[in-house]
Amino acid sequence: MGIRVYKPTTNGRRNMTSLDFAEFTTSTPEKSLLVSLKSKAGRNNNGRITVRHQGGGHKRHYRLIDFKRNKDAVEAVVKTIEYDPNRSANIALVHYTDGVKAYIIAPKGLEVGQRIVSGPEADIKVGNALPLANIPVGTLVHNIELKPGRGGELVRAAGASAQVLGQEGKYTLVRLQSGEVRMILGTCRATVGVVGNEQHGLVNLGKAGRSRWKGIRPTVRGSVMNPNDHPHGGGEGKAPVGRKAPSTPWGKPALGLKTRNKKAKSDKLIVRRRNEK
């Protein structure tokens, strides 16, 4: 999709851009694949804020996405390419030959009328899903499983892709978008291709209101709060932090502290960390 640039007719329109939606073939989603979605506004079951800066925004329906792609050897035809308000990637409605309808993440280059299939014997074509052990070295993939049968969990955002680097016993070496090289079981499935809508990250919202439409609330700096609200708060005028290092609102170290569990069992599956040269 292309980027639409607006003329600076108002302050809010100045520098504003959006996607032109030329790729979409319908604006009406498949009703049988919609479920209602209650707004949580960042609260948990106790009503306490667990995720800040969430709330408001346009009401949405959730689209049921098939991340498992486990209907083996059953062909599906791509019927539509659609917008999904719940994710950055676009989605595609596919009709299987046995009558089942499903939504999948739309990879770059997927077109209406194209036929896709899942299974170990599937061809290496955009949109086909097969075990990592059956995918040639160098192939770009997305929607990667971490456990066989659990459904794709990695590489699902707009424009994202991972590359198959090789096979090592029962594991497949995969380079993720971050640069991390990881071993994943060869029986885990992945979909061939790069996730579409790769220009999503180039959009300039232009005004605060567009963030509010998305359900994103303002992010207030700690230094402009009161001392009872944040460790950085208080003082006269533009006061410095007043501590050895910046802190979170709850007094824990911020900016640079490693938060990964040092005893994570998956450490043995990481061949190269994302921050290593």
Swiss-Prot record:
Domain of life: Bacteria
Region entry Disordered, spans: 219-277
UniProt feature, compositional bias: Basic and acidic residues: 264-277
PROSITE patterns: RIBOSOMAL_L2
Any one GO biological process: cytoplasmic translation
InterPro entries xref list: NA-bd_OB-fold, Rib_uL2_dom2, Ribosomal_uL2, Ribosomal_uL2_bac/org-type, Ribosomal_uL2_C, Ribosomal_uL2_CS, Ribosomal_uL2_dom3, Ribosomal_uL2_RNA-bd_dom
Single GO cellular component term: large ribosomal subunit
UniProt KW keywords: Ribonucleoprotein, Ribosomal protein, RNA-binding, rRNA-binding
GO MF terms, alphabetically ordered: rRNA binding; structural constituent of ribosome; transferase activity
Keyword check for RNA-binding: yes
Family: Belongs to the universal ribosomal protein uL2 family.
Record's subunit section: Part of the 50S ribosomal subunit. Forms a bridge to the 30S subunit in the 70S ribosome.
Job description of the protein: One of the primary rRNA binding proteins. Required for association of the 30S and 50S subunits to form the 70S ribosome, for tRNA binding and peptide bond formation. It has been suggested to have peptidyltransferase activity; this is somewhat controversial. Makes several contacts with the 16S rRNA in the 70S ribosome.
Name under which the protein is recorded: Large ribosomal subunit protein uL2
